[in-house]
Amino acid sequence: MFTVFLLVVLATTVVSFTSDRAFRGRNAAAKASGLVGLTDKRQECCSYPACNLDHPELCG
């Protein structure tokens, strides 16, 4: 009975560890996607003088 308990604990730990790694990978992909989106907006904004004046932090 104790052996079954240890196997369940080990299996739970492995599943939890694998899920955490997958979550961090998806989170990194989402951040990279957000940075690409910001770069596109920066190019669009900096080409318009009114937007350039309103958002100098983007066009610096």
UniProtKB/Swiss-Prot annotation:
Propeptide: 17-42
UniProt KW keywords: Acetylcholine receptor inhibiting toxin, Amidation, Cleavage on pair of basic residues, Disulfide bond, Ion channel impairing toxin, Neurotoxin, Postsynaptic neurotoxin, Pyrrolidone carboxylic acid, Secreted, Signal, Toxin
Modified residues (Pyrrolidone carboxylic acid): Q43
Matches recorded under Pfam families: Toxin_8
S-S bridge residues: C45-C51, C46-C59
Transmembrane segments: none
Protein name: Alpha-conotoxin-like 289
Family: Belongs to the conotoxin A superfamily.
Cleaved signal peptide residues: 1-16
Region span, Ser-Xaa-Pro motif, crucial for potent interaction with nAChR: 47-49
GO annotations of cellular component type: extracellular region; host cell postsynaptic membrane
GO MF annotation: an example: ion channel regulator activity
Entry's localization field: Secreted
Functional note: Alpha-conotoxins act on postsynaptic membranes, they bind to the nicotinic acetylcholine receptors (nAChR) and thus inhibit them.
Tissue occurrence: Expressed by the venom duct.
Keyword NADP in record: no
Modification type Cysteine amide: residues: C59
Secreted recorded as keyword: yes
Swiss-Prot/TrEMBL domain comment: The cysteine framework is I (CC-C-C). Alpha4/7 pattern.
